[in-house]
């Protein structure tokens, strides 16, 4: 195999074959590298070998099959010698006693330990996992070899992963310039966006800043929603008009923030400093939105004389049109509804796996007092009059609580529903 660019990197070992690792490994294999994909989950490895992906992502199955059929991608449960190693494992958050959270580096450091026996002088390690500042240097310091280490944080959106892997700009921070340049050589094989070179601390901080910026702006929208609920203003109408200002772009409110990035990453800044009070306040506000939704739903039902209701949850995933339920606000909304005596059924046309039982649509709505929309799936947006007419006879009470403002409310109202919208103080 011919070498790529200025550095003799021919073989790459990708550790972690989840939402980021598998697309990255497959992309590299389809661009001429010899790639070994490693995951400790044997069932996942076997599924990949058999072309049975548990990740719902446009184009991914075709990409993976192409990589495997080309013989450039092999997947297995253990690492082996390579010229470069890319770590794509989760970095979950651990909760502290005060309710704050910190980064759990267990998976990252386990991946490092797994590749140490196979490292040779001159090898490169790239960490794609989101990590707190100074972690890349910490990894380098744990390895007693003359190697190169860089951080190239993933920046893709579920549902558009393959498109964004290619088109998005990337940032690469190295422990030294050569580390960053070596990593750039790998990524420029398929990245069409610009690749920016910096130091590892800056790269770590940039990724956290990106997601913190979004989290804070969502928190602002959620706070506006709570205020508008209180004073009788429709927050969605107010936001739409406010955004007519050329320098204003308020985001939409919702039942909370989910996914493995935005709801987690700001805590990695908070754990490093006492100067992140604003960031922490925003994170706590968003974390408390499921409780606010639960309280609002039960309060409105109580006003109508409905106690211990059966509630139909529409949406288990953290965002629309994906199967990913990680950190989904739906989990906490359901948990709190159950704790307050409600009976809950959940329907999601995309999710296969969830902490609570998933029902068919008919099972979910049978005998229901209230439908609560928590996820903006197209399947929910596209509910039309005929669909509503089919739903009506199966319900006990015609009540809808829309936290995403995606339903055609007039259709539901014409069918006799009471429709409550998050951030609108009146029915």
From Swiss-Prot:
Keywords: NAD, Oxidoreductase. It comes from the Archaea. One of its GO terms (molecular function) is UDP-N-acetyl-D-mannosamine dehydrogenase activity. InterPro entries: 6-PGluconate_DH-like_C_sf, NAD(P)-bd_dom_sf, UDP-Glc/GDP-Man, UDP-Glc/GDP-Man_DH_C, UDP-Glc/GDP-Man_DH_C_sf, UDP-Glc/GDP-Man_DH_dimer, UDP-Glc/GDP-Man_DH_N, UDP_ManNAc/GlcNAc_DH. Catalyzes the four-electron oxidation of UDP-N-acetyl-D-mannosamine (UDP-ManNAc), reducing NAD(+) and releasing UDP-N-acetylmannosaminuronic acid (UDP-ManNAcA). Belongs to the UDP-glucose/GDP-mannose dehydrogenase family. This is UDP-N-acetyl-D-mannosamine dehydrogenase. It comes from Methanococcus maripaludis (strain C7 / ATCC BAA-1331).
């Amino acid at each position: 195999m011919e070498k790529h660019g200025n550095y003799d990197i021919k073989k790459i070992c990708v550790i972690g074959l989840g939402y980021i690792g598998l697309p990255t490994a497959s992309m590299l294999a389809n661009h001429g590298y010899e790639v070994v994909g490693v995951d400790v989950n044997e069932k996942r490895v076997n599924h990949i070998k058999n072309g049975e992906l548990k990740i719902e992502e446009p184009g991914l199955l075709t990409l993976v099959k192409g990589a495997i059929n080309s013989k450039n991608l092999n997947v297995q449960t253990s690492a082996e010698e390579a010229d470069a190693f890319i770590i794509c494992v989760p970095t979950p958050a651990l909760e502290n006693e005060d309710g704050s959270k910190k980064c759990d580096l267990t998976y990252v450091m386990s991946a490092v330990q797994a590749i140490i026996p196979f490292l040779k002088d001159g090898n490169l390690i790239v960490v794609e996992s989101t990590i707190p500042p100074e972690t890349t240097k910490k990894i380098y310091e744990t390895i007693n070899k003359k190697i190169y280490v860089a951080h190239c944080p993933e920046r893709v959106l579920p549902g558009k992963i393959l498109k964004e892997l290619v088109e998005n700009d990337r940032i690469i921070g190295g422990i030294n310039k050569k580390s960053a340049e070596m990593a750039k050589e790998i990524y420029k094989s398929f990245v069409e966006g610009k690749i920016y070179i910096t130091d590892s601390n800056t790269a770590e901080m940039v990724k956290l800043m990106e997601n913190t910026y979004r989290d804070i702006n969502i928190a602002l929208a959620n706070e506006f929603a709570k205020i508008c609920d209180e004073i009788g203003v429709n927050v969605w109408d107010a936001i739409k008009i406010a955004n007519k200002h050329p320098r204003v772009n308020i985001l939409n409110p919702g039942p909370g923030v989910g996914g493995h990035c935005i709801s987690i990453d700001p805590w990695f800044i908070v754990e490093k400093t006492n100067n992140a009070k604003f960031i922490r306040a925003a994170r706590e506000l968003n974390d408390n939105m499921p409780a606010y939704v639960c309280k609002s739903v039960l309060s409105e039902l109580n006003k109508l004389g409905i106690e211990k209701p059966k509630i139909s949850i529409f949406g288990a995933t953290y965002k629309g049109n994906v199967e990913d339920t990680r950190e989904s606000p739906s989990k906490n909304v359901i948990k709190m509804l159950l704790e307050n005596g409600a009976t809950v059924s959940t329907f999601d046309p995309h999710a296969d796996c969830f902490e609570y039982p998933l029902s068919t649509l008919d099972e979910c709505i049978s005998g229901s007092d209230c439908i609560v929309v928590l996820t903006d799936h197209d399947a929910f947006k596209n509910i039309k009059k005929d669909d509503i007419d089919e739903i009506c006879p199966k319900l006990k009470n015609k009540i809808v609580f829309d936290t995403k403002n995606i339903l055609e409310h007039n259709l539901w109202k014409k069918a006799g529903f009471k429709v409550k919208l998050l951030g609108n103080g009146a029915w």
